[in-house]
Amino acid sequence: MALSAETESHIYRALRTASGAAAHLVALGFTIFVAVLARPGSSLFSWHPVLMSLAFSFLMTEALLVFSPESSLLHSLSRKGRARCHWVLQLLALLCALLGLGLVILHKEQLGKAHLVTRHGQAGLLAVLWAGLQCSGGVGLLYPKLLPRWPLAKLKLYHATSGLVGYLLGSASLLLGMCSLWFTASVTGAAWYLAVLCPVLTSLVIMNQVSNAYLYRKRIQP
């Protein structure tokens, strides 16, 4: 027997709620896992994976889930209030990423090694630069009077698209980091595959949220 449209809608909404809740838990759990693994403070380098996972796994994921209609932790706030919280979380993510990038460059300098020559390093640098541009673009949405010639709807569309690309870049840098000698020397077997699934899962949830809640809606409008 075929399901009614209303039943399908309820099932789909329940699945999105469950996936959003999973994204919250996975983003936090992955960041804690990396922190335990890296033991921040044990060396200069130890702060790099902690800060980068905090930036691209936890803070950035939470910044985007703020707008989720099913799994936002800030439902009680107005749209404007959630937008400001989103910008604050994104700014914190950028600061953590900049600090993490700076510390690993300093670490490489102290060892006399080349830096930003691996795919992980290059992806990380690109993700940090993209995050900086994204935060700058967010100012135009917080204060649209600064860009009077640009329709607000188009600004939101560009910001959403760019933000999704930036998030995927951050996730890619995390995935490449998990292929590094430092990570693979400590995490092997099933644990490694489970760790890899974390940014993959959160990326899928964020892609679904942005596409369905904004990009797809804009595409079907005349």
Swiss-Prot record:
Topology relative to the lipid bilayer, per the entry, is: Multi-pass membrane protein
**Cytoplasmic-side positions:** 2-17, 68-85, 144-162, 208-222
Residue intervals on the Lumenal side: 39-46, 107-122, 184-186
Query: What biological processes does GO assign it?
Result: ascorbate homeostasis
**Which of this chain's residues are annotated to bind heme b 2?**
H86, H159
Which of this chain's residues are annotated to bind heme b 1? H48, H120
Keyword field contains Electron transport = yes
Q: Where in the cell is it found?
A: Endoplasmic reticulum membrane; Cytoplasmic vesicle membrane
**What cofactor is needed?**
heme b
Q: What is its EC number?
A: 7.2.1.3
Q: Where are the transmembrane segments?
A: 18-38, 47-67, 86-106, 123-143, 163-183, 187-207
A Pfam family reported for this protein in Swiss-Prot or TrEMBL: Cytochrom_B561
Gene Ontology CC terms: cytoplasmic vesicle membrane; endoplasmic reticulum; endoplasmic reticulum membrane; vesicle
Q: What class of enzyme is it?
A: translocase
Q: Which reaction does it catalyse?
A: monodehydro-L-ascorbate radical(out) + L-ascorbate(in) = monodehydro-L-ascorbate radical(in) + L-ascorbate(out); Fe(3+)(out) + L-ascorbate(in) = monodehydro-L-ascorbate radical(in) + Fe(2+)(out) + H(+)
* pH-activity dependence text: Optimum pH is 6-7 for the electron donation reaction to monodehydroascorbate reaction. Optimum pH is around 6.5 for re-reduction reaction process of the oxidized heme with ascorbate.
Keywords in alphabetical order: Cytoplasmic vesicle, Electron transport, Endoplasmic reticulum, Heme, Iron, Membrane, Metal-binding, Translocase, Transmembrane, Transmembrane helix, Transport
The Cytochrome b561 domain covers which part of the protein? 14-217
This protein's record includes keyword Metal-binding: yes
Q: What does this protein do?
A: Transmembrane reductase that may use ascorbate as an electron donor in the cytoplasm and transfer electrons across endoplasmic reticulum membranes to reduce monodehydro-L-ascorbate radical and iron cations Fe(3+) in the lumen of that compartment.
Protein name listed in UniProt: Transmembrane reductase CYB561D2
Which organism's genome codes for this protein? Homo sapiens
